[in-house]
């Protein structure tokens, strides 16, 4: 395919147009008075959302240079969402402000590499200031307030705080759709481990990139599964039972994996293959934990069991299994409660007898997985569109609350970023590096200004006023009052604020140092073929 190339200012401006198109659509959602965006879907009802990363994913631009610019900003939103579960809109607004100021200086003759170094040093300083000023989240009320801001709903915030209180800060919280209205919290036996599906072809929900199995059989194998003839007798029995199958093994490869994938694609048989968690003896122990939790047995040569002779009686079961690319969650395993309690007691005894800090830490992890359980938040709504949007908000709020517990919280509403700007005075920079730091200083006010604008206030006036307020005091956009934001419950996890700034600066530096863009040449649509038979004389076709 032939390519087109743009250089210098033309290249950078093309990328900036794409960034602006995406950022302008996303930034209207920022803050408590932010608006919604409607996303058209090829199939089904449109989605209404105020989640930055969901909006960014949907934007596809026609111009090849603009398309690349938009894709780079999508990466900012996605990366921030992956790390912290929130802050995608803030990251996009910061990226837009950094690029706008940066390109203005590049056009005026500044050295892009000098600006890049200045931006990096300034971001490092602001990050350090944010982490120093962060307050630890200790109470249930603080967790509820942080989650409520992310979800835009106090009821959701309180429910998440309750869930974290019950399963612990590292515990598993999943969100499911409910047939009833409102929200419910259920605690179930369950486990999550950090291994995902071996092949993307196992995905059952393409939009969320998840494989969901309802009431599956669970096969646990301590060795590799590579030949299909070993697996076939058992597969036939599972297919006859009409249930899906989760395979957890050291690895699933070769023709065994191909057979599972082909049958999944054809719709003959639903299965998911996952690598077993851990290594060596720890892997064996974790497989045994899963076996006890699900009421199954580990197929292993050590205990005289092989795949060829394995029967359905050796398989575990669970109410539901959800597998993503990175992790597997087993909900309500069918294991015997006495056996689970016995296993928990055994692990506790091992923890007490262990001399190694590392071993003790790993045993604690196993104990938390086995005894902690899974909190399931069931969300209901009047329509499918509302239900999807609500479920997404709750999932983001859960990640947000966990981020708050991890690194602490700072004043929300863009105030922490703006009030960390004076720390840049401590940097002794000169020339283009000083200009780069100044670009960051200007950009730090962008989120607050956008929140004020979305709330119908004058951005410049609000930013000026907040600059002169004591640390942590600022605009509560929900009420229009200037107050101590942490006391008022307007807080952001510092992990969210920090990630948003770091990711935005990373992409802005790439924009400024770009000297050429190579893009695919847009193909002209082929002219429709004429009628080979020709028309009838005198007739108008």
From Swiss-Prot:
PROSITE patterns, per database record: CHAPERONINS_CPN60 (PS00296)
What are the alphabetically sorted keywords of the record?
A: ATP-binding, Cell wall, Chaperone, Isomerase, Nucleotide-binding, Secreted
The GO annotation for biological process reads: protein refolding
SUPFAM superfamilies noted in UniProt? GroEL apical domain-like, GroEL equatorial domain-like, GroEL-intermediate domain like
Q: GO molecular function, one example?
A: ATP-dependent protein folding chaperone
In which residues is ATP bound?
29-32, 86-90, 413, 476-478, 492
Q: Which locations, inside or outside the cell, does it occupy?
A: Secreted, Capsule; Cell surface; Secreted, Cell wall
Mitochondrion: is it a keyword of this entry?
Answer: no
Instruction: Tell me which EC number(s) this protein carries.
Output: 5.6.1.7
An example Gene Ontology CC term for this record = cytoplasm
Which reactions fall under this protein's catalytic activity?
Answer: ATP + H2O + a folded polypeptide = ADP + phosphate + an unfolded polypeptide
**Assembly description:** Forms a cylinder of 14 subunits composed of two heptameric rings stacked back-to-back. Interacts with the co-chaperonin GroES.
Functional summary from the UniProt entry: Together with its co-chaperonin GroES, plays an essential role in assisting protein folding. The GroEL-GroES system forms a nano-cage that allows encapsulation of the non-native substrate proteins and provides a physical environment optimized to promote and accelerate protein folding.
Family to which this protein belongs = Belongs to the chaperonin (HSP60) family.
Q: What is this protein called?
A: Chaperonin GroEL 2
Q: Gene symbol? A: groEL2
């Amino acid at each position: 395919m032939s390519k087109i190339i743009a250089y210098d200012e033309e290249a950078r401006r093309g990328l900036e147009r794409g960034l602006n198109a995406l950022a302008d659509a996303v930034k209207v959602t920022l803050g408590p008075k932010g608006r919604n965006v409607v996303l058209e879907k090829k199939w089904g009802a449109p989605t209404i959302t105020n989640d930055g990363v969901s909006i960014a994913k949907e934007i596809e631009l026609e111009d090849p240079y603009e398309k690349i610019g938009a894709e780079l900003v999508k990466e900012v939103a996605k990366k921030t969402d992956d790390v912290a579960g929130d802050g995608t809109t803030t990251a996009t607004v910061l990226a837009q402000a950094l690029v706008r100021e940066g390109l203005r200086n590049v056009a005026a003759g500044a050295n892009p590499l000098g600006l890049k170094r200045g931006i990096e040093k300034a971001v490092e300083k602001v990050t350090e200031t944010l982490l120093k000023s962060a307050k630890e989240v200790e109470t249930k009320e603080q967790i509820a307030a942080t989650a409520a801001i992310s979800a835009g709903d106090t009821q959701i915030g309180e429910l998440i705080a309750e869930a974290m209180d019950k399963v612990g800060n590292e515990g598993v919280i999943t969100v499911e759709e409910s047939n009833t209205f409102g929200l419910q919290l259920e605690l179930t036996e369950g486990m999550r481990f950090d291994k995902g599906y071996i092949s993307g072809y196992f995905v059952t929900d393409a939009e969320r990139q998840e494989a969901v199995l309802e009431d599956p059989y669970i096969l646990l194998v301590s060795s590799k599964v590579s030949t299909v003839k070993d697996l076939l007798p058992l597969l036939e029995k599972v297919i006859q039972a009409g249930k899906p199958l989760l395979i957890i093994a050291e690895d699933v490869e070769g023709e065994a994996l191909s057979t599972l994938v082909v049958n999944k694609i054809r719709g003959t048989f639903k299965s998911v293959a996952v690598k077993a968690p851990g290594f060596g003896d720890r892997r064996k122990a974790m497989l045994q934990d899963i076996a006890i939790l699900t009421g199954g047995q580990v197929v292993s040569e050590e205990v005289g069991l092989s795949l060829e002779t394995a029967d359905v009686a050796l398989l575990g079961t669970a109410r539901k299994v959800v597998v993503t690319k990175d992790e597997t969650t087993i909900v309500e395993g069918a294991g015997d409660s006495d056996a689970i309690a016995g296993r928990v007691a055994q692990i506790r005894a091992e923890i007490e007898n262990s001399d190694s800090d590392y071993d003790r830490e790993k045993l604690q992890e196993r104990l938390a997985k086995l005894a902690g359980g899974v909190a399931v938040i069931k969300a209901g709504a009047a329509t499918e569109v509302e239900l999807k949007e609500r479920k997404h908000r709750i999932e983001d709020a859960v990640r947000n609350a966990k981020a708050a517990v991890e690194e602490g919280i700072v004043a929300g509403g863009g105030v922490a970023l703006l009030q960390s700007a004076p720390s840049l005075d401590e940097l002794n920079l000169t020339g283009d590096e000083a200009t780069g730091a100044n670009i960051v200083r200007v950009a730090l006010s962008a989120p607050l200004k956008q929140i004020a604008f979305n709330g119908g206030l004058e951005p410049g006036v609000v930013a000026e006023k907040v600059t002169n307020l004591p640390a942590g005091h600022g605009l509560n956009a929900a009420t229009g009052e200037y107050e101590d934001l942490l006391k008022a419950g307007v807080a952001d996890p510092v992990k969210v604020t920090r990630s948003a700034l770091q990711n935005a600066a990373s992409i802005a530096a790439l924009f400024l140092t770009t000297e050429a863009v190579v893009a695919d040449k847009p193909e002209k649509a082929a002219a429709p073929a004429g009628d080979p038979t020709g028309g009838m004389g005198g007739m108008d076709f």
